[in-house]
């Protein structure tokens, strides 16, 4: 993203691709880098196949997350960070660790039957968000981060763990837009303030509902975690403590 931003500062738009890579973490981490330079950031990555096409019974495409981040004027940045599946795979993993059920529509079992059992979902398929629409988005992201870059896509990408003879093979795409090359920054800032106020002025279905912009809930949660710490289920604490012991690190404070 740094290179994409440098290009955008010169030309207005900067695009950079990475091939033959690995899992690159949270997509919004990269797009929010652009916000700090008064730019709009976009990024996507492909991933190990986790979803079938509509009507399919095999994993063919990853959930290929995408993110946009846009400076929010006087408000927090507007950040979209979403997988092309109905939910990120990590949420199913966490539910399985906690022994919790998952909502219907998140995933299927290994035969393609809808399930609320997180353990069965771990060996099944993720459901695309919006059915064929989410699948279509995932395919486009696969093509942006695979063939366009001369890299891998689909079943050519290995699992996150278990194969260490070569890189996982993921591709990443980064784009930055320098706002000042399109419109004066102050004018953009005022427009963002007005737009966010407009969205938040929407009447609600009841008095307990709050209108949020994309990324605002996560922004508030991050601030809370910085103040109060990160709660972890006991199973994860025990796993971390065991890793500490195996690595010769004192787990004091974890248990």
Please report, for each region that a protein language model flagged, where it lies by residue.
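Predominant activation on well-ordered alpha-helical scaffold segments within soluble catalytic domains
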Residues: 2-5, 32-35, 69, 105, ...
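Short glycine-rich or small-residue beta-strand-to-loop segments that form or flank ligand, phosphate
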Residues: 14-19, 128, 174-180
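Phosphate/diphosphate-binding glycine-rich loops and adjacent basic-rich segments that engage nucleotide
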Residues: 51-119
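Catalytic-core signal marking the mid-to-C-terminal active-site face
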Residues: 148, 153-255
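Glycine-rich phosphate/pyrophosphate-binding loops
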Residues: 38-50, 144-160
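Small-residue-enriched flexible segments
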Residues: 89-150, 162-167
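A glycine-rich, acidic short-motif signal
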Residues: 1-78
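Glycine-rich beta-alpha junction loops
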Residues: 84-87, 133, 179-181
